[in-house]
């Protein structure tokens, strides 16, 4: 089997030639023997093009970098994937004004401000510019207020959406891609499709933001409180976001070249939501995107990294094929219980914590974690992966220990 065939066999709950291993990179510090020269510089930290609309990298990254990263992982037999994220635009009548304001008696940080002048009125977004020193490889705060950006949430002074009156304005910021953007995306997909076919690599298409977008737009506290105290406002906001997600997904499926549609859900776990609220606001929307993907002949994946079992019935009823990520350090039930719940219906990705086990575990602890994950979650319907990525601070010897342990146990029956 090639890597794509191995992934698809796992997603279909067939037995692959061995359990796949996948490692999402989010600034991963590659060891010297896996680096390469590109654009006159050594590529020390690895990323993914799926982040291009969400984060500001400290170093150059392109689809060509993605291709070389896949090759480097393949040299270690790791089942890397290619990832794409469709573009979008703002309404042509929207005007943007950016400025910064200095600290004052009530605010110790500089404030980065952006105002969108839309046909429905102005929409202002203000965050703190914290200027903290970050280590090599970590994403950085941009010099403007991006609409969708994880770093905005703890730094927010005025989030983009604070009341129902902002929703009409928001719609002008979530428009379809321009002809130029669409042409560029089609060219990108042509390159990705060609490389994926030549190398036998799976392609993931990240076209749906879901509740992550709501958290970026409103802040976490406002998002959760709105769901409980202003359900009509929250439902309309969800409808706006999912209409946007659906259009991006339809465009991505029309262009083609994607094996699995993925919806983000880092902010949709039981850290924030009860199963009842998830069922009320999210499950119907997830099911719509899953059904849309299935009609186009692709699989559908969802991301939730904590509280998997409490949300299991909602995930199952949403027709999800693949679930990222199962983190054993965050699950209150053992991995075998998780496997029993989803067996034969939803394939699982994860099994080892990147932030805990790979970051600070001993070689033996890593080995035991890998063996436990593969034995309890495999061999069918499972892709072993660090949850949820390899970050710049995870030591290479620990990644190497994970790979070695995986080779010991990947052929388990």
Tell me what each language-model feature is:
Residues 1-40, 145-413:
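Active-site loop segments of alpha/beta catalytic cores
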Residues 15, 48-49, 108-110, 118-122, ...:
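Short, solvent-exposed loop/edge-beta patches enriched in aromatic
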């Amino acid at each position: 089997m090639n890597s794509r065939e191995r992934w698809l066999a796992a997603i279909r709950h067939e037995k692959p030639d061995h359990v796949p291993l996948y490692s999402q990179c989010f600034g991963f510090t590659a060891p010297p023997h896996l680096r390469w020269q590109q654009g006159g510089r050594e590529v020390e930290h690895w990323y993914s093009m799926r982040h291009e609309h969400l984060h500001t990298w400290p170093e150059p990254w392109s689809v060509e970098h993605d291709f070389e990263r896949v090759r480097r992982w393949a040299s270690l037999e790791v089942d890397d994937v290619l990832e794409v994220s469709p573009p979008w635009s703002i309404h042509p009548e929207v005007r943007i004004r950016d400025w910064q304001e200095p600290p004052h008696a009530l605010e110790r940080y500089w404030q980065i401000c952006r105002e969108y002048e839309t046909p429905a009125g102005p929409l202002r977004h203000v965050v703190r510019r914290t200027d903290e020193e970050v280590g090599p490889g970590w994403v950085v705060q941009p010099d403007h207020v991006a609409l969708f950006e994880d770093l905005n949430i703890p730094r927010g002074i005025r989030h983009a959406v604070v009341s129902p009156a902002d929703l009409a304005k928001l719609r002008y910021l979530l428009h379809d891609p321009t002809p130029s953007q669409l042409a560029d995306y089609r060219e990108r997909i042509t390159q990705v499709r060609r490389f994926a076919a030549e190398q036998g690599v799976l392609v993931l298409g990240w076209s749906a933001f879901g509740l992550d977008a709501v958290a970026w737009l409103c802040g976490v506290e406002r998002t959760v409180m709105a769901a409980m105290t202003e359900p009509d406002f929250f439902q309309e906001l969800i409808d706006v976001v999912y209409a946007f997600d659906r259009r991006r997904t339809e465009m991505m499926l029309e262009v083609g070249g994607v094996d699995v549609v993925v919806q983000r859900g880092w902010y949709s776990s039981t850290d924030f939501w009860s199963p009842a609220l998830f069922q009320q606001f999210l499950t119907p929307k997830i099911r719509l995107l899953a059904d849309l993907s299935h009609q186009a002949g692709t699989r559908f994946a969802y991301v939730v990294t904590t509280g998997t079992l409490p949300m299991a019935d909602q995930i199952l009823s949403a027709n999800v094929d693949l679930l990222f990520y199962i983190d054993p350090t965050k699950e209150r039930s053992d991995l075998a219980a998780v496997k029993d719940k989803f067996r034969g219906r939803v394939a699982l990705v994860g099994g080892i914590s990147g932030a805990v086990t790979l970051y600070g575990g001993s070689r033996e602890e890593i080995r035991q974690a890998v063996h436990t994950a593969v034995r309890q979650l495999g061999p069918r319907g499972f892709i072993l992966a660090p949850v949820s990525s390899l970050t710049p601070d995870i030591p290479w010897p620990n990644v190497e220990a994970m790979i070695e342990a995986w080779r010991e146990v990947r052929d388990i029956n």
